[in-house]
Amino acid sequence: MKKIALTMVATSILGVSSMSQAAINVCVFDLLGKSGESFQMAQEWALAAKGWGADVNLIPRQDEGVADNDFKAGKCDAVFETSMRARQYNKFAGSIDSLGGVPSNAVAQKVIAYALDARNATKMTTNLGGKKYEIAGIAPLGSAYIFVRDKNINSIEKAAGKKFAVLGYDPAQKIMVQRVGAQAVISDISNFVAKFNNGQVDMVGAPAYAYKPLEIYKGLGTNGAMFNFPVLQVTADLVIRPEKFPAGFGQKSRDYFVKNVAKSFAMINRLEAGIPAKYKMNLNPADKLKYQKLLREGRMELTKQGIYDPAMMSVLKKARCAVDKANFECALGGE
């Protein structure tokens, strides 16, 4: 009996041990799969995660929709995807990508560090339909710029009637494009630039991160241009099911992302510098102010519609005004 009891205890201990060491599957969206910048960043994070008691198995996904569906289906215990898609799990973090909300890398750095701070831990966790989700990291992917096939489309007025590829899962893009009188062409992250390159659409918004992998230069050709004016800041969220990870893992992971945010911006600066100067079209001060006001109006409208989180809108405005006190909106209410 004693031997049987000891055998049972040993089996139980081994079972618990194997459970605690079981690999945690994390789906990582990267346009270039394993060779992409995001996947390489995830590999460094996974190495650090071992020190927090998690054995992470990274699963590359070049189609973001597939990565998200795998997470929903339980094939992955976490997913690293754009905040625009991750907004469904956490509106506070997902609203950093609001239209015109983060006009520079300096503002982005302040906002990301604040959001990931321990004081906002409760805002990083949500309970949806009985399922718990937690944002365990936010990484910047850079400002999104508008690319046009014809550099003569150099104002809002001239964008009227033009076809603009928008991501179907982000209603904010569709609403904003319609506000300027352009035609929203519903697309996905896997084909929105392809439509620009083959002439199905006249305009597209994307960060420098996508310039080479998606070959945006093919759509620009010899007559295209990039508005050197950031429309929004693209970020990626690491969404986890906290029960699948060791206790306290979420905050340790968020602290890691804060420490590495400067490294991420170094990558972004390198990618932005890689876009040839011949394509970059600067706006005059009057047009720049006009666009800022248009984005502000759209942002406030989308917040009223419940698409953006009001608390994050307040955080973004404070960060913008801390970096640029002369900003016209700093003396205005409404956000």
Question: What role is predicted for each listed range?
Answer:
Residues 8-16:
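Bacterial N-terminal signal peptides
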Residues 213-229, 238-241:
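A beta-strand-loop signature enriched in Asp, Gly, Thr, and Trp
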Residues 82-179, 230-335:
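Contiguous mixed-secondary-structure segments that line small-molecule binding/active-site clefts
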Residues 23-82, 88:
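N-terminal (or domain-start) structured segment
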Residues 23-52, 132-198, 202:
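Bilobed "Venus flytrap"/periplasmic-binding protein-like clamshell domains
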Residues 1-8:
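Bacterial N-terminal signal peptides that target proteins for export
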Residues 59-98, 147-149, 204-220:
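Pocket-flanking alpha-helical
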Residues 16-22:
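Sec/Tat signal peptide C-region and signal peptidase I cleavage site
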